[in-house]
UniProtKB/Swiss-Prot annotation:
It comes from Mus musculus (Mouse). Belongs to the NOLC1 family. One of its GO terms (biological process) is neural crest formation. This is Nucleolar and coiled-body phosphoprotein 1. The lineage of its organism: Eukaryota, Metazoa, Chordata, Craniata, Vertebrata. Interacts with RNA polymerase I 194 kDa subunit (RPA194) and with casein kinase-II. Interacts with DKC1/NAP57, NOP58 and fibrillarin. The gene is Nolc1.
Length: 702
């Protein structure tokens, strides 16, 4: 697939694939909007579908980290062109890249300077790291690609806004695109069509555990495979969720740390080279700068901004509650606009929770935003939002988690395109409602399945949490997906809490996916957040009950990935059982315990008797009194030449220069020995004749 590849692939090459995917997914409304927005036409029915490409890529990606063509790392442009050889796979991967760089690219378009400078700087690093992270990056790109289908479904107007920047970014960031794209393409060329599709899954895997992509891939692969089986959107969501699930895990332990850690994390991901291509090129640029910032100032523009995030983390974390909105507004009007808009929307549903969570997200966002590297800020912000989300999750305030999720979404998007934020905000006002409504309606059905998966992902993510901490910041898509995941797990909880409301949370999920997919979809974020927060209010009681059931529901979702309906039914049943079955199970447990207690006394007696007998025997044994000897002298044969290690036993000792010293020192031990030896060295010691004779023992090599 890489053999045809000198044709430049553009995002529009993927439009037919996405359009077909939408139609196959029975998203006719979204498909029609997408077709109108992009002017895409139906693809040849015989051509590979996104799912085919994705499945092929998934199967190949797990087997072929080999695609990390380090030799081609520098030649990412060629690799990119090579990947263009397969329009479907490469287009999808590159579309992902460009859509993924719909986040970065828009950043690049808005930040052409940063794109050209950091990304070129990131090129070398990205190429080097891309060779190691090319798979992850390609996977990530494909995830982005699949997120884009979701986004394009939900945020088609935004997609329009995003794609022009993406194209511009392509021209301006052709280098960075080629780097990031080529890294994915390097991998994709070999398994381009399937890889394109599989990339999303593999990306999720790799991204889920950037530090340990291989491990993350299998786990995520399973979750993703299930997700994809339920529905491509659900697979996208599940991928995002899995990625995000890992980020939330990171975030759970660290809320405020996120602000401080974001830059470090961004740097760490870069170092790990687990960053996705977008993140690898941009984030590596930015993150390397953070890394260098740690070591020293970085020449590229982003670094100075990264220090700001470092400074802000401590202050902003404290300020989260009080100055959250204000800092966000003051620091980045555009990004804060989207933040504030999303926050305002969030506030109506859950004013108290939202104000706190948004503030946290905003400071983090601010910090990240202050850094010129949107990728760095994206990753750090994503991590920070994810952490607040995770934190809220642990308390299990239904409303709070959702606002945090929404905020997380808003934050990532804002970071994703700090420059794009104005655009995204415009898109928000114009198309956020439409996108969110349509995407919510369509996604409601798919996300019903995705929700359980998302929860499953969240659960699986905890194990991945540490690796992914780097992974989140490592890639924008990771961070965005993590944010999406954060949101997703919460909507899933809502779904589980309210089976009827499943469709509603699902829209939230899709909105989340959209928003995370493209920075321009912040409007969809806002709308989705609003919806989410409104839903939280209604579903809060149910959510709380479902949280108890949330685990079973997610487990069921894992088992029930077969069909969304089954998942929904299981969720509903579990919800019902949450209040009833769990208490019942507790009673059963108590009964079982009582039964155990009845039988235990006998067992205990038996056990007690046995131990009492053995200790007596052991005490009676002589071994207890004798000290333990690993080596018994009587059983070991020692060579006569080394049996005696004293000075006198050495050959040539008699009449030697050190003989007189030995006469004094052989009776001396401890500190006094060193003292005496030093006196001999410093004083006027004169022993016997100094001999050059070799008295060492030579052992035969037997």
């Amino acid at each position: 697939m890489a053999d045809t590849g000198l044709r430049r692939v553009v995002p529009s090459d993927l439009y037919p694939l996405v359009l077909r995917f939408l139609r196959d997914s029975q998203l006719s409304e979204v498909a029609s909007k997408f077709a109108k927005a992009t002017g895409a036409t139906q693809q040849d029915a015989n051509a590979s579908s996104l799912l085919d490409i994705y499945s092929f890529w998934l199967n190949r990606s797990t087997k072929a980290p080999k695609v990390k063509l380090q030799s081609n790392g520098p030649v990412t442009k060629k690799a990119k062109k090579e990947t263009s050889s397969s329009d479907s796979s490469e287009d999808s991967s590159e579309d992902e890249d460009k859509k993924a760089q719909g986040l970065p690219t828009q950043k690049a378009a808005a930040q052409v300077k940063r794109a050209s400078v950091p990304q070129h700087a990131g090129k070398a690093a990205a190429k080097a790291s891309e060779s190691s992270s090319s798979e992850e990056s390609s996977e990530e790109e494909e995830e982005d690609k699949k997120k884009k289908p979701v986004q394009q479904k939900a945020a088609k107007p935004q997609a329009k806004a995003v794609r022009p920047p993406a194209k511009k970014a392509e021209s301006s960031e052709s280098d960075s695109d080629s780097d990031s794209d080529s890294s994915s393409e390097e991998e994709t060329p070999q398994t381009q069509k399937p890889k394109a599709a599989v990339a999303a899954k593999a990306q999720t895997k790799a991204e889920a555990k950037p530090g340990t992509p291989a491990k993350a891939q299998p786990k995520v692969a399973n979750g993703k495979a299930a997700a994809s089986s339920s529905s491509s959107s659900s697979s996208d969501d599940s991928e995002e969720e899995k990625k995000a699930a890992a980020p939330p895990k990171k975030t759970v332990p660290k809320k405020q740390v996120v602000a401080k850690a974001p830059v470090k994390v961004a740097a760490a991901p870069t170092q790990k080279s687990s960053s996705s291509e977008d993140s690898s090129s941009e984030e590596e640029e930015g993150q390397r700068q953070p890394m260098k910032k740690k070591a020293g100032p970085y020449s590229s523009v982003p670094p100075p901004s990264v220090p700001l995030p470092k400074k802000s983390p401590g202050t902003q974390a404290p300020k989260k509650a009080a100055a959250q909105t204000q800092p966000a507004d003051s620091s980045d009007d555009s990004s804060d606009d989207s933040d504030s808009s999303s926050e305002e929307e969030k506030k109506p549903p859950a004013k108290t929770v939202v104000s706190k969570t948004p503030a946290k997200a905003a400071p983090v966002k601010k910090k990240a935003e202050s850094s010129s590297d949107s990728s760095d800020s994206d990753s750090s912000e994503d991590e920070a939002p994810a952490k607040p989300v995770s934190t809220t999750k642990s308390p299990k305030p239904a409303v709070t988690p959702k606002p945090s999720a929404a905020k997380a979404v808003t934050t990532p998007k804002q970071p994703a395109g700090s420059n794009q934020k104005p655009q995204s905000r415009k898109a928000d006002s114009s198309s956020s409602e439409e996108e969110s409504s349509s995407s919510e309606e369509e996604e409601a059905s798919k996300k019903s399945a995705t929700t359980p998966k998302a929860k499953v992902t969240a659960k699986a993510a905890p194990a991945k949490q540490a690796p992914q901490a780097a992974g989140d910041s490592s890639s924008d898509s990771d961070s965005s997906s993590s944010e999406e995941e954060e949101k997703t797990p919460k909507p899933p909880a809502k779904k589980k809490a309210a089976g009827g409301a499943v469709s509603t949370p699902a829209p939230g999920k899709k909105a989340e996916a959209k928003s995370s997919s493209s920075s321009s979809s912040s409007s969809s974020e806002d709308s989705s957040e609003e919806e989410k927060k409104k839903k939280p209010k209604a579903t809060t009681p149910k959510i709380q009950a479902s949280k108890a059931n949330g685990t079973p529901a997610s487990l069921n979702g894992k088992a029930a990935k077969e069909s969304e309906e089954e998942e929904e039914e299981e969720e509903t049943e579990e919800k019902k059982k949450a209040a009833g079955t769990k208490p019942g199970s507790g009673k059963k447990r108590k009964q079982n315990e009582t039964a155990d207690e009845a039988t235990t006394p006998q067992a205990k007696k038996v056990k007690l008797e046995t131990p009492n007998t053995f200790p007596k025997r052991k005490k009676g044994e002589r071994r207890a009194s004798s000290p333990f000897r690993r080596v018994r002298e009587e059983e070991i044969e020692v060579d006569s030449r080394v049996a005696d290690n004293s000075f006198d036993a050495k050959r040539g000792a008699a009449g030697d220069w050190g003989e007189r010293a030995n006469q004094v020192l052989k009776f001396t031990k401890g500190k006094s020995f060193r003292h005496e030896k030093t006196k001999k060295k410093r004083g006027s010691y004169r022993g016997g004749s100094i001999s050059v004779q070799v008295n060492s023992v030579k052992f035969d090599s037997e």
